[in-house]
Amino acid sequence: MTIGKYNIIYADPPWRYESGKVQGAAENHYPTMSIDNLCALPVAELTAKDCALFLWATFPQLPEALRLIKAWGFQYKTVAFVWLKRNRKNPTWFYGLGYWTRGNAEICLLATKGKPKRQSAGVHQFIISPIE
């Protein structure tokens, strides 16, 4: 089977939080992976010479996200998107439990390999949307 090469990789890894059990933890909702297992995924084999990676991460996982970017053969550039979460049923802000502060935002990091071209100057960084 031949696998294509992609110009864009859009990833929302199943991060495993190593800081202990927390109510609402990802492990309670879906299978997660260790950072070592995520780094071992053969993502580099799927990328074109010029490729952009959009990688969703939470602030507690930022060091792991930067490690993952490097392991997959990319170079960190910036924060592409910031998701500001609203509650599902009313127009108030959603707040998670957090480790130090009550978290709201998630970030999507942008990393590149080669020299991918910017597609539009009209893309904004903020995404304001309810949680699913």
Indicate residue ranges for each PLM-predicted region:
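Class I S-adenosyl-L-methionine-dependent methyltransferase catalytic core
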Residues: M1-E132
